[in-house]
Amino acid sequence: MTYSKNVFIPVTNICRNQCGYCGFRREPGQPGARLMKPEEVISVLENGVRAGCTEALFTFGERAEEVPGYGEMLEEIGYSSTLEYLVFLCETAIDIGILPHTNAGIMTRSELEALKPLNASMGLMLESTAVLAAHKDCPGKIPERRLETIREAGKLKIPYTTGLLIGIGESRDDRIESLEAIAALHREYGHIQEVIIQNFAPKPGTEMENFPEPAVEEMMDSVELAARILPGDVAVQVAPNLIDPKSLIAKGVTDLGGISPLTIDWINPEAEWPDVKNLQKKLGDIPLKERLPVYPPYVKKGWYSERIGSLIKRLSDNSGYRKQPGTENAEDSEK
């Protein structure tokens, strides 16, 4: 059972989509609207390295430039585009000693090309191939557009994370179709390292605040479908702060995602991360093994750029997993 140790950095919560279930999004000028300043991000990155984290998860609202007022927020910190700022943040993370994983919504091929050398992996939740009421005001949630981004990442050989959001109005057949679409892309390009099966959690003040959460049985079935439909080299992940993973492991869960010792889950702020030691106790004789934000097979295949290669080598062991923290420099000096 694998996991990574990360810092969760919500660079901006300004977003062009208005999902019926989202409590993260804000409009410029609203209370809680943010674009993190460089010094704020750098502080989190430095604390993350000190705490032994290997992953900087950069999350963004999608295409914030389309939202009036966001451009001025960018200008205030000295940048002309989100991409320009993100490139700076990724470069800074690498220099500080932590691997970027960017999740910024749908992207063009040229945007992916700009970010590929600076990211250990990238991600975009497919959520569903179904057209849903929850996504009615969301130009970025058109399934074909999301699949196109995932496809372009495959063509560029970017180790990739995607997933399904369970319980937002989709049917079981929709879940099967979504998993089959992901499986087909992986068979073609070999780049999907993990698929998250994430349970919907209602947020107060949203359109779907009274929508029922999916039952545990529904999650067990969804995990079972994922394990059956996805190729065997794709990890099936659940979020241990949103659901007790114990009952899902027998159904095919192999990974517990990024767990942070420092930062909250900004998308689900009410759901605390479990402590890794407590999680290990709960899992009993199933050993927890730490990985990097890029999975071991992709480390071994060399699916990374020269820019991050030395950092990946420093942080990974011979099997491509996380090297025992504290031994990185000692082992480097022995080589």
From Swiss-Prot:
Family matches, as CDD domains: Radical_SAM
Domain of life: Archaea
Domain Radical SAM core: from-to ranges: 1-246
InterPro entries named in the record: Aldolase_TIM (IPR013785), CofG_family (IPR019939), Elp3/MiaA/NifB-like_rSAM (IPR006638), F420 (IPR034405), rSAM (IPR007197)
Pathway of action: Cofactor biosynthesis; coenzyme F0 biosynthesis
GO molecular function per UniProt: 4 iron, 4 sulfur cluster binding; 7,8-didemethyl-8-hydroxy-5-deazariboflavin synthase activity; iron ion binding; transferase activity, transferring alkyl or aryl (other than methyl) groups
Reactions accelerated catalytically: 5-amino-5-(4-hydroxybenzyl)-6-(D-ribitylimino)-5,6-dihydrouracil + S-adenosyl-L-methionine = 7,8-didemethyl-8-hydroxy-5-deazariboflavin + 5'-deoxyadenosine + L-methionine + NH4(+) + H(+)
Keyword Iron-sulfur carried by entry: yes
EC number annotated for this UniProt entry: 4.3.1.32
Keywords, alphabetical: 4Fe-4S, Iron, Iron-sulfur, Lyase, Metal-binding, S-adenosyl-L-methionine
Known cofactor(s): [4Fe-4S] cluster
SMART domains: Elp3
Cofactor stoichiometry and binding remark: Binds 1 [4Fe-4S] cluster. The cluster is coordinated with 3 cysteines and an exchangeable S-adenosyl-L-methionine.
Binding site for [4Fe-4S] cluster: 15, 19, 22
PANTHER family tied to this protein: 7,8-DIDEMETHYL-8-HYDROXY-5-DEAZARIBOFLAVIN SYNTHASE, FO SYNTHASE (COFH)
Quaternary state and interactors: Consists of two subunits, CofG and CofH.
The family this protein is said to belong to: Belongs to the radical SAM superfamily. CofG family.
Function: Catalyzes the radical-mediated synthesis of 7,8-didemethyl-8-hydroxy-5-deazariboflavin from 5-amino-5-(4-hydroxybenzyl)-6-(D-ribitylimino)-5,6-dihydrouracil.
Name this polypeptide is given: 7,8-didemethyl-8-hydroxy-5-deazariboflavin synthase
Species of the source: Methanosarcina mazei (strain ATCC BAA-159 / DSM 3647 / Goe1 / Go1 / JCM 11833 / OCM 88)
Lineage: Archaea, Methanobacteriati, Methanobacteriota, Stenosarchaea group, Methanomicrobia
